[in-house]
């Protein structure tokens, strides 16, 4: 599977936003903006927003373009549909639900078969969760201290579209998130514009 190879903190600083949520991601020796003072063209700004959105979800360009194409064919608002689809990916939801401390760790957990969706093992990171889907750890995975610690001591943002049962170690997608609820800093309209002109 292809991976985004640029170091995470360096990528966050290049994009000008903390796409990984780590408190030290934007730290850098010296002063001034990492991206410098060069003024971007309209195309450059659109490209930057696209790169931000890809980085938030750790999705490679080929797969990202498939999400864009599907969103453009939908009857909803393209940018909102795009981000909703990315947000509901299993790897992202495993992170949002608190089973993992990062999307990268969440993706590894999914790939290694640690998660169940509605009681069935799912090992496809891009699997799209649907309204009412329940996510839980496999019985053997419940013995892994790190996963339990992640879940019970989760320090991330509490989201209204996720319901957590700490005692049962289960979570459920109780609503399809609106754009306003999804905690990412990106102008999805500019992302759509970037692909519309290509």
UniProtKB/Swiss-Prot annotation:
NCBIfam families: PRK05327.1, rpsD_bact
UniProt-listed InterPro entries: Ribosomal_uS4, Ribosomal_uS4_bac-type, Ribosomal_uS4_CS, Ribosomal_uS4_N, S4_RNA-bd, S4_RNA-bd_sf
Species for this entry: Alkaliphilus metalliredigens (strain QYMF)
GO MF term list: rRNA binding; structural constituent of ribosome
Gene3D superfamilies from the UniProt entry: Ribosomal Protein S4 Delta 41, Chain A, domain 1 (1.10.1050.10), RNA-binding S4 domain (3.10.290.10)
Coiled coil: none
Signal peptide: none
One GO BP annotation of this record: ribosomal small subunit biogenesis
Record-linked SUPFAM superfamilies: Alpha-L RNA-binding motif (SSF55174)
Gene name of the encoded protein: rpsD3
Assigned keywords, A-Z: Ribonucleoprotein, Ribosomal protein, RNA-binding, rRNA-binding
PANTHER family: 30S 40S RIBOSOMAL PROTEIN, SMALL RIBOSOMAL SUBUNIT PROTEIN US4M
Protein name stated in the entry: Small ribosomal subunit protein uS4C
Pfam families from the UniProt entry: Ribosomal_S4, S4
All residue ranges annotated as the S4 RNA-binding domain in the record: 88-148
Record-linked PROSITE patterns: RIBOSOMAL_S4, S4
